[in-house]
From Swiss-Prot:
Family the UniProt entry places it in: Belongs to the cytidine and deoxycytidylate deaminase family.
Keywords associated with the record: Hydrolase, Metal-binding, RNA-binding, tRNA processing, tRNA-binding, Zinc
Organism: Methanopyrus kandleri (strain AV19 / DSM 6324 / JCM 9639 / NBRC 100938)
The protein, known as: tRNA(cytosine(8)) deaminase
Family annotation (InterPro entries): CMP_dCMP_dom, Cytidine_deaminase-like, THUMP_dom
Span of domain CMP/dCMP-type deaminase: 1-102
Length: 278
């Protein structure tokens, strides 16, 4: 993907392959080439770039949507253009545009789709952060994975499931991708889907007994969170199915005990099962 602004042509994929992916990164561009890079730590990457480098008349590439405060500093420093990963303007990009700075938003999935990817290898969940949208996180994940040699289809979860990003690794080892995401994005909850592909109740039963049952502590509860109609007709049906499987191996299911929760996510014909201790 290439975009043009402020007299420069920016090759988005090329830039992503050349910058660090540990956290939010801001790159200063001249003639479409990187001349300086700063990473976020105790302060935002864009502010570090402005403070340490001459950005006047140049283009800045950011791997997240700039906040309002960074946007003000970028505009005051005289940047000519800003390219950022994400979807939706927000206050930062809106301020830049009002200040006469060319702004281009890019996303790995243009146009962005809200349907889950065909096969869900990884589910990333986050919450409680008012400054991050599902699209922002999807863009960061794309930046990180492609920069390390993976190819992946990434989509924010449907609108009724906020704080979730779904990932299908199309090139590279999904297990390695998961470990990379856990290492580089420790603030997010990242897990492999135990079930991928077509729904199969016999296979689901085997996975429950193999992966879920040994990790459960008595007494425990069983819960089901239904994301989309399909495999089960209701959350209660999913609860009963999981409960029956566990009861068949000697686990008494107490649906009212909140201390340990077995979560069932039903996405179309795909089902994943995970354990959450509380």
């Amino acid at each position: 993907m290439k975009v043009s602004l402020a007299g420069q042509t920016v090759d988005v994929k090329k830039i992503l392959n050349e910058i660090p992916k540990r956290t939010v990164t801001a790159a200063l561009l001249e003639g479409g080439e990187i001349v300086a890079v700063e990473e976020a730590d105790d302060e935002h990457a864009e502010r570090k770039l402005v403070r340490r480098h001459d950005v006047e008349g140049k283009v800045v590439f950011v791997t997240a949507r700039p906040c309002l405060y960074c946007a003000r500093e970028l505009a005051e420093a005289g940047v000519a253009g800003v390219v950022y990963l994400g979807r939706g303007r927000g206050l930062g990009p809106y301020y830049l545009a009002r200040s006469g700075v060319e702004v281009v938003e890019v996303h790995p999935d243009e146009p962005l789709g809200y349907d889950p990817v065909d096969r869900l290898d990884v589910l990333l969940t986050f919450g409680g952060n008012p400054y991050l949208t599902e699209e922002d996180v999807a863009a960061r994940v794309y930046c990180l994975l492609t920069g390390r040699g993976f190819d992946a289809d990434i989509a924010p979860a449907p609108e009724n499931l906020s704080g979730r990003v779904e990932i299908m690794v199309t090139r590279g080892d999904p297990d390695e991708a998961v470990e990379l995401l856990k290492e580089e994005l420790p603030v997010f909850r990242i897990r492999r889907f135990l079930i991928s592909g077509e729904f199969d109740r016999d296979e689901l039963r085997e996975r429950i007994l193999e992966d879920i049952e040994p990790r459960i502590l008595d007494p425990f509860a069983v819960r089901a969170r239904i994301a989309r109609a399909g495999a089960f007709s209701s959350s209660r049906e999913a609860e009963v199915f999981i409960g029956d499987v566990l009861t068949s191996v000697g686990r008494e299911v107490n649906l009212n005990d909140p201390r340990t929760v077995v979560t069932v996510d039903v996405l179309g014909p795909r089902v994943s099962v995970g354990v959450e201790k509380r």
